């Protein structure tokens, strides 16, 4: 059993920080010490921001995004193309696509991907909500922006099957050589996907 080196409040802060993805126990200790050293500049404002977020953050009942309003800012933005819907696994994927700034469309967050080995089936994801949105008739194209994993591809095939009875175009993100990527450093699966998705110049 390890010795306690700080009071229970600091230990609790470290334990909670260690639960954040990307932070282990050692990184959590470093982060906690940094916050404590900068108490007025960081710790107090961070505590306030976290309390406010805990009180105000909502899950959008339309798309599954997180925001402080429901429906979210994206769903209520009338400048976005209402007929195109990008389907993503998680909110982090939605945010990544928004940072890219390529398309001004609406989204649908599944909340994960199908994974029978982990016990995650269609009822555990927001697929029913997607089908209902498409059934309304306003959506003309669904872009499946799921990860290029076995589970992601399984999810894409399942969704495509669920939407097959609707008059909607279902597309998916191209897979292959990343911008600035060198062929010698790519794995065989990525190269094979790039060859299959080749385009005419």
Curated annotation (Swiss-Prot):
Which one Pfam family would you cite for this protein? RecR_HhH
GO MF terms here are: DNA binding; zinc ion binding
List residue spans of C4-type Zn fingers. 60-75
Q: Does the keyword NADP apply?
A: no
What are the recorded Gene Ontology BP terms? DNA recombination; DNA repair
Q: Does the keyword DNA repair apply?
A: yes
Keywords of the record, alphabetical order, are: DNA damage, DNA recombination, DNA repair, Metal-binding, Zinc, Zinc-finger
Q: Can you give the residue ranges of the Toprim domain?
A: 83-178
Family that this chain belongs to: Belongs to the RecR family.
Fetch the PANTHER family from UniProt. Answer: RECOMBINATION PROTEIN RECR
Q: What does this protein do?
A: May play a role in DNA repair. It seems to be involved in an RecBC-independent recombinational process of DNA repair. It may act with RecF and RecO.
Name the record gives this protein: Recombination protein RecR
Give the organism, scientific name: Brucella ovis (strain ATCC 25840 / 63/290 / NCTC 10512)
Query: In the UniProt record, what gene is named as encoding this protein?
Result: recR
């Amino acid at each position: 059993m390890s010795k306690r080196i700080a009071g229970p409040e600091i230990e609790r802060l470290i334990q909670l920080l260690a639960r954040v993805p990307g932070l282990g126990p050692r990184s959590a200790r470093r982060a906690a010490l940094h916050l404590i050293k900068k108490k007025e500049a960081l710790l107090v404002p961070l505590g306030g921001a976290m309390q406010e977020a805990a009180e105000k953050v909502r899950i959008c009942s339309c798309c599954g995004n997180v925001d402080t309003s429901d429906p979210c800012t994206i769903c209520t933005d009338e400048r976005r193309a209402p007929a195109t819907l990008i389907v993503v696994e998680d909110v982090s994927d939605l945010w990544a696509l928004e940072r890219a700034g390529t398309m001004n469309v609406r989204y649908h967050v599944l909340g994960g991907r199908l994974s029978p080995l982990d016990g995650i089936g269609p009822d555990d994801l927001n697929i029913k909500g997607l089908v209902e949105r498409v059934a309304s008739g306003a959506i003309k194209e669904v872009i499946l922006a799921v990860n290029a994993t076995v589970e992601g591809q399984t999810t894409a095939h399942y969704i495509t099957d669920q939407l097959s009875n609707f008059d909607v175009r279902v597309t998916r993100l191209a897979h292959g050589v990343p911008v600035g990527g060198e062929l010698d450093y790519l794995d065989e699966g990525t190269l094979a996907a790039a060859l299959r998705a080749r385009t005419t110049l």
